Amino acid sequence: MKDLLKIFKSQIKTDEFDAIKIALASPDMIRSWSFGEVKKPETINYRTFKPERDGLFCARIFGPVKDYECLCGKYKRLKHRGVICEKCGVEVTQSKVRRERMGHIELATPIAHIWFLKSLPSRIGLLLDMPLRDIERVLYFESYVIVNEGLTNLEKNQILSEEQYLNALEKFGDEFDAKMGAEAIKLLLNSINLKQECNKLRDELNNSNSETKRKKLTKRIKLLESFIHSNNKPEWMILTVLPILPPDLRPLVPLDGGRFATSDLNDLYRRVINRNNRLKRLLELSAPDIIVRNEKRMLQEAIDALLDNGRRGRAITGSNKRPLKSLADMIKGKQGRFRQNLLGKRVDYSGRSVITVGPYLRLHQCGLPKKMALELFKPFIYGKLEKKGLATTIKAAKKMVEREESIVWDILDEVIHEHPVLLNRAPTLHRLGIQAFEPILIEGKAIQLHPLVCAAYNADFDGDQMAVHVPLTKEAQYEARSLMMSTNNILSPANGEPIIVPSQDVVLGLYYMTRKKINAKGEGMIFKNSKEAEKSYQMGFSELHAEVQVRITEYKKIDKQNFLKNTKIENTTIGRAILWMIVPKGLPFFMVNKILGKKSISKLLNTCYRILGLKSTVNFADQIMYTGFNYAARSGSSVGIDDMEIPKKKSDIISEAEIEVSEIQEQFQSGLVTAGERYNKVIDIWAAANERVSKAMMKNLSTESTTNKQGNEEKQISFNSIFMMADSGARGSAAQIRQLAGMRGLMAKPDGSIIETPITANFREGLNVLQYFISTHGARKGLADTALKTANSGYLTRRLVDVAQDLVVTEDDCNTHKGIIMTSVIEGGDVKESLREKALGRVTAENIIKPYSSDILITRNTLLNEKWCNVLEKYSIDSIKVRSVVHCDTNFGVCANCYGRDLARGNLVNKGEAIGVIAAQSIGEPGTQLTMRTFHIGGAASRAASESSIQVKNSGIIKLHNAKSVINSEGKIVITSRNVELKILDKFRRTKESYKVPYGAIIAKMDEELVNSGEIVAKWDPHTIPVISEVNGYIEFVDMIDGQSITRQTDELTGLTSIVILDTSERTSLGKDLRPALKIVDSNGENVLISGTDMPAQYFLPGKSIVQVDNSIKISSGDTLARIPQESGGTKDITGGLPRVADLFEARRPKELAILAEISGFISFGKDTKGKRRLIITPYNNNTPYEEMIPKWRQLNVFEGERVEKGDVISDGPESPHDILRLRGVQAVTKYIINEVQEVYRLQGVKINDKHIEVIIRQMLRKATIIKSEHSEFLDGEQVEYSRIKVSNRNLSKIGKKTAIFSRDLLGITKASLATESFISAASFQETTRVLTESSVAGKKDELRGLKENVIVGRLIPAGTGYAYHKKRLKNCQKDKTKEKNKPSSISVEEASANLSELLNSTL
């Protein structure tokens, strides 16, 4: 019997599917789903509680309420399976069919589906080419629409009001046909011949020139084509049959007290059925038109509410005044089907508890409370008890476990042995938020966590809770052990550095044991090895910090097994010698023979991992932790109030500052400085005073004097507890110590501005009431900020994950030669990020040639590991071309070589690695550490912004990039080109420093000259832009008429007069069209040409310029003719932190963005309009010039006649990434976004590898717009997936046809997520209704390529171990297909099931 049931069950196993298609349902299809028509609005009988016949819960339509039992009770039990009761008409089967059987309602009149009507752009409106307003008026019975115009002068689709309709009737009689309501729209949709219409529109498109019209036509053609391709019929957007959800999905549950809780859908369905039945009755009675119309309108509204309540008009509310939840609300939003149930399922076999420290654990262990383990592993225990014969049945085993017999604990030990569990701490911001451990049973009720994994979890023990999950199957356990075990996750996937790093106590302990002390007990002793040194310390013969000599044996790794041995006597301390005992063979002694802070310990672990591999590193990390805890306890570090020593100079410094402030106050009152300057100066004074106090304090804290062996006084690093904690990096920082023992300093108001009275007290002295009040200001803002930040950061992560979720490594090599050029990041005089850091773990895109020779140093496609990076440094190579995901040629996914090293493992990335999600997590996870605020520039900052010279830090050679210069009359070099870069190179020609030099700067040294450090190489005036002559000659004024275009001003102090150009707004009507300029002529009055061109040398002057020369005087090249004052833009806010990162990834166009040159050519200015000037760029080959209107208030960087290259900055401002992509290409936009994002993270000290940002950029660039389709299948102006264009163009060029011409688009991450090929992924992200409407009309097919789609349909994801599974599945699919082709036709499914049921019935 059991076997038979098994056979029966195996019959209904679902087939593997490859894709999911969404389309419009035709009325016949809806009827085919249905098991019967619902005719009555009744639900259940109030006395018997049985469902009413033909009602919304009818058992005849939807199936029996109880398993294998008909409604009237005539047939019960399994043996009547499949019988239909002749009395109540119910089929005897399982009651779960009530979850899958649907019903339907035959509507008395067609009804428009609100999604296709109101979800913008309205599909019905687009198809009929009618405005939405008009369609609505027809649908809701306000106007008529002409369905058939006949022989009249009316037009089809024309809207007539009641009055116009009556007039037309009088005039034409029944020549024409006009209707209202959904039936009219249905007739119109029915009458469209899609193919004909489509061809007609294509012809129109080819003949029309207006941009807006073309856009509209393209939209309609796309819609029509999608209907043709998908075999959807337009009239299916109008419902004639309404499907009804299975009743168990909209349940009616009895509550105690005789009341019922019901799903809102039942109310909505009831309204529909009531109105539909009433309408049927009215139609049978042939009631007056106006009544029928009203009923039809009400039915339309009822169905609108059922499908999407509140989309049109007021939402229908229930008895308790809240809007009813419609079908659309069921699937959208955070509580909808997608995000609540499909992507966020709850997990069985899990528990949670508070965490506490387990300092004695090994790295791969965690402490699990016995009580929890017993509950979590129950089924395993039952199984074991039964298998061993200790319990006869499961019930008996259950009793034993409940009684907690002693044998149960032994069994639990066996079960748990080598069965990993997963520990998760919410919020899981990156993949290290879930790791696997082997459980160790402990008493108590708290989970014990290994201290070293706290950093990965971001956990602390102040009441954090964690969840435990049990992997059940063998495969799951194997996966947890091999991939998720904490010992396999030593490196952070974000930057490839160890994340298992000691912190706090451990760091303090190691720091303490590696410190030196002058004249400590046992100084100068010599030991034969570390063991002896430790013994001496334990016996009390010497102190931990004593400087001694120890014989040390170092091992250097040659290959996997062999080491090179080297023994020598080293000067060290006892503590370091003890620490050397736990260091694994293969690491050099110098790494331990120094004071170890947090950074050095991290470096030690990193080196250990790179040289000795995983196993040694894990053991070493554990040993470090035990040793650290041990010696931290012995150090006895504690915080006492006397440890916070206040510097003696403090009061003097503060009183000096107060005197300075009062001086400034006096100047302000006598009117010498403005209020703003006073405020900035006061703040600067206090900031400087605070610096001085804290310097004095740190000097005081960090050193102490002691007597050495010779009896002389000597300074040594202090053993002050607070200083040691900060110095080792265990806890606290100089800034915090400053508040304890220096002065608290300046505080900010909640709006970010600084309060000018600082808090001069520190926490040791205590604050008075005013000081306390001021400090609460900032503190509250901090708390509010944190709350906001968490939400914003979470949303950013969600968008990033969504845009990148389908990127997986799918092949080894795409063989592309493209790549990005890597150089070190240098700003001013300091290297922000070296080439080594940037290139590590990348694959070279071209051979790297040895400098000054033609030998190949590193071949193409080499993975640059630490060894190769040393080679790069040795040959001082400063720029290389490496592969990048942005340029990867793989169609779906990325190849391993373009990605490079898997940062968390340290080798080339494996196929199936979900790099998209990892990138998103790496960028999103530190989001909460970024600031939320925008910075206000003021005080010290604003002065730094206006530098006026370049002083070099290193000696070297000067290199000028794209510099044009002239020599002025004083023999100095003046720069006359824009965006000049000045670099300082060392003797290997490596860039050491890099500066931007503005137009008009005076340079002290020429290209390729030597400079010494500290030399000033360039100077300029930061407040004005000069106009510099490039030729010699005489000045001639053009259009400079006193009172009309210029005015003369006399300076009161010097008595000199100067000519000032009037702004257009200040000129008289006569002077409006004048264009003042300085022209340079030779002695005969002829134009002088700019060298190398045929442009006369004349300089147009913008308003407010100050002219520095007079008419017809002689000038020589390099002289300043005029100065344009720079408007000090006041305090411009810089968007920083999280909002800046979000702006970059959303590719938002900044306000007042930089204007870039669209083409290369010469600049000239045309006729101005009221508020704008006309900029004209004439290309070098005199083709059609490019014109642009620019607002007058924009400061331009270019003068008439200047040459610009495509993409040069014409007017300063923040650059728009879209412009950079259009004018400078993919490479430039990649570089721009990476640098800008890294800038924000660098400020917070967060390290993220560039390749993660590149992964997101690749996803932002995945669409392109077709400019000219040529022979391809695309439309002009259509936006298409870039990979599709690539594939299509490859195929076209193979057969020798013209390929499509396209331009790449940059989409923000939200847009890119919604524009993904997969509609399931897009619908579950945002705007569910719109996505589903669009996809169903187009009959979209989801190939289930991404991770999200597969999670939603409940399959393994195509990444990691699931990647192999899907590959295998596809192989088998193809095999089966070929088999089926060759297989002779066999018995049909129907016959088989008939035979089976016969067999079953005979045996029962």
From Swiss-Prot:
Cofactor: Mg(2+); Zn(2+)
Record keywords: DNA-directed RNA polymerase, Magnesium, Metal-binding, Nucleotidyltransferase, Transcription, Transferase, Zinc
Enzyme class, first EC level, given as a word: transferase
Presence of the UniProt keyword Lipid biosynthesis in the record: no
Catalytic activity as recorded in UniProt: RNA(n) + a ribonucleoside 5'-triphosphate = RNA(n+1) + diphosphate
PANTHER family xref list: DNA-DIRECTED RNA POLYMERASE, DNA-DIRECTED RNA POLYMERASE SUBUNIT BETA
Function: DNA-dependent RNA polymerase catalyzes the transcription of DNA into RNA using the four ribonucleoside triphosphates as substrates.
Similarity field: Belongs to the RNA polymerase beta' chain family.
Protein name from the UniProt record: DNA-directed RNA polymerase subunit beta'
Lineage: Bacteria, Pseudomonadati, Pseudomonadota, Gammaproteobacteria, Enterobacterales
